[in-house]
């Protein structure tokens, strides 16, 4: 049953009474996920069971996610007449798109990726390998979407309109350094915050039925006014919206990562506060995500760890010899040892029985965070970082340089989050 409530933005949201939206069962050698749509109809999607041993004691939801992450081949998608045209602005390698793709698979919707744009050439190449967008741009969105809000189309915008034609669902994760909690408050005035207005312009030009924008929680402290202006523009364009900060650790991701989301729609949106109510899971440790990779032998960059200096190798040895997870000040470099600091986790070792810390593009360095493997005397590999970021093995990262792997994986959004948001709204 669905009721209407007034959300924090004084807009109507749909409040759905508690129901089992995701249901899981075993059918032969397959794990089946059945989604109950608002119409009452059920849609099923499958993954192969990893192991038939001890299934009676397994949480089938957890096992489904585990099996999906370990799939080497992309799972089948049932062909239906329902389809959706998706554009991903600031796409990166495609974390948001992957989650929406999986939500479409779960709902029996055919996703078509109409447009993607990103400045990072390596990230966009990964996106293109996995989603084959009809049109993509390895350039700044501002170069092509360059008109003022409310103004007639520019020549460049008309070219984009002619190429892309129709967008039903816009995804956008504008560069967030200007809002990041890792930066001081003065950087919230960063010019990159104005990129939100380019998202507003794309919305104005294409009038999609749905919009999902992602950023760091610090965006709510925006000093430039662009965030407030963005929400006001959604209202003037006739969109309902709701917003939330989600903690990935509580939603099935083996990682402590908080992200801000705003979902907008031409019809009242389902209350985002119900994401935690309907889809929360028990905390999943990193062992859940990467235990099968401990014995993974490979000599390619994706499956090997970074090389470290002799001094950092010695620090890793010290952690294991003394069964420690934090490096004492006495073993740290002078910049930490000789003055007070709050970087307790830096040079640290991951806990095997806990979720990982936030994965960043520094995951290959001992000095960038708690990225030393729990069981092995090395930092985590790109493959392990991808798993922790909820990228399955069938996702094709291609052949990149180590720094490129770290950038595209560390800057991504765990796909589980956009999966849940899209599932909650599109069903």
From Swiss-Prot:
Its EC number(s): 2.1.1.37
All residue ranges annotated as the SAM-dependent MTase C5-type domain in the record: 84-427
Activity control summary: Somewhat inhibited by MgCl(2) and spermidine, strongly inhibited by MnCl(2).
EC supergroup of this enzyme: transferase
Summary of temperature dependence: Rapidly loses activity at 37 degrees Celsius in the absence of DNA.
Gene3D superfamilies: DNA Methylase, subunit A, domain 2 (3.90.120.10), Vaccinia Virus protein VP39 (3.40.50.150)
Induction note: Constitutively expressed during exponential growth. Encoded in an operon with ydiP and in a second with groES, groEL, ydiM and ydiN. This second operon is heat-inducible.
Disulfide bonds: none
Entry-linked InterPro entries: C5-Methyltransferase, C5_MeTfrase, SAM-dependent_MTases_sf
UniProt note: pH dependence: Optimum pH is 8.0.
Keyword annotations of the record: DNA-binding, Methyltransferase, Restriction system, S-adenosyl-L-methionine, Transferase
Pfam families: DNA_methylase
Presence of the UniProt keyword Methyltransferase in the record: yes
Single GO term (MF): DNA binding
Catalytic activity line of the entry: a 2'-deoxycytidine in DNA + S-adenosyl-L-methionine = a 5-methyl-2'-deoxycytidine in DNA + S-adenosyl-L-homocysteine + H(+)
GO biological process, one term: methylation
Family membership: Belongs to the class I-like SAM-binding methyltransferase superfamily. C5-methyltransferase family.
Subunit structure: Monomer. May form a complex with YdiP, also seems to be active alone.
Name of the protein in its database record: Type II methyltransferase M1.BsuMI
Native source organism of the sequence: Bacillus subtilis (strain 168)
């Amino acid at each position: 049953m669905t009721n209407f409530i007034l959300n924090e933005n004084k807009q109507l949201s749909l409040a759905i009474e508690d129901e089992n939206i995701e249901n899981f069962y075993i059918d032969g050698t397959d794990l089946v996920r059945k989604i109950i749509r608002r119409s009452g109809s059920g849609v099923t999607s499958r993954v192969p069971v990893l192991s038939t041993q001890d299934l009676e004691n397994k949480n089938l939801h957890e096992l489904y996610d585990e099996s999906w992450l370990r799939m080497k081949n992309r799972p089948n998608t049932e062909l239906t007449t329902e389809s959706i045209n998706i554009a991903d602005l600031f796409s990166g390698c495609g974390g948001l798109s992957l989650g929406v793709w999986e939500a479409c698979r779960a709902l029996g919707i055919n996703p078509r990726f109409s447009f993607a744009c990103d400045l990072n050439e390596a990230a966009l190449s990964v996106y293109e390998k996995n989603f084959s967008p009809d049109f993509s741009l390895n350039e700044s969105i501002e170069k092509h979407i360059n008109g003022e809000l409310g103004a007639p189309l520019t020549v460049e915008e008309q070219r984009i309109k002619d190429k892309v034609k129709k967008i039903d669902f816009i995804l956008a994760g504008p560069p967030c350094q200007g809002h990041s909690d890792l930066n001081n408050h003065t950087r919230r005035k960063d010019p990159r915050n104005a990129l939100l207005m380019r998202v507003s312009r794309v919305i104005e030009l294409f009038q999609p039925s749905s919009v999902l924008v992602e950023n760091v929680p610090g965006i709510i402290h925006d000093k430039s006014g662009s965030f407030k202006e963005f929400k006001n523009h959604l209202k003037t364009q006739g969109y309902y919206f709701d917003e939330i900060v989600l903690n990935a650790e509580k939603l099935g991701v083996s990682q402590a990562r908080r992200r801000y989301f705003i979902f907008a729609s031409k019809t009242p949106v389902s209350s985002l506060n119900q994401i935690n109510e309907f889809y929360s899971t028990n905390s999943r440790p990193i062992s859940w995500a990467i235990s099968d990779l401990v014995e993974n032998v490979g000599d390619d960059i994706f499956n090997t760890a970074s090389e470290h200096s002799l001094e950092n190798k010695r620090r890793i040895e010290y952690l294991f010899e003394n069964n420690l997870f934090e490096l004492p000040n006495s073993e740290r470099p002078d910049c930490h040892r000789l003055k007070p600091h709050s970087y307790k986790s830096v040079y640290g070792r991951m806990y095997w029985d806990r979720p990982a810390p936030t994965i960043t593009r520094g995951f290959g360095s001992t000095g960038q965070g708690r990225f030393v493997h729990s069981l092995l005397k090395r930092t985590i590999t790109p493959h392990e970082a991808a798993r922790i970021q909820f990228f399955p093995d069938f996702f094709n990262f291609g052949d990149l340089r180590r720094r490129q792997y770290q950038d595209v994986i560390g800057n991504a959004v765990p796909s589980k989050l956009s999966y849940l948001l899209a599932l909650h709204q599109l069903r």
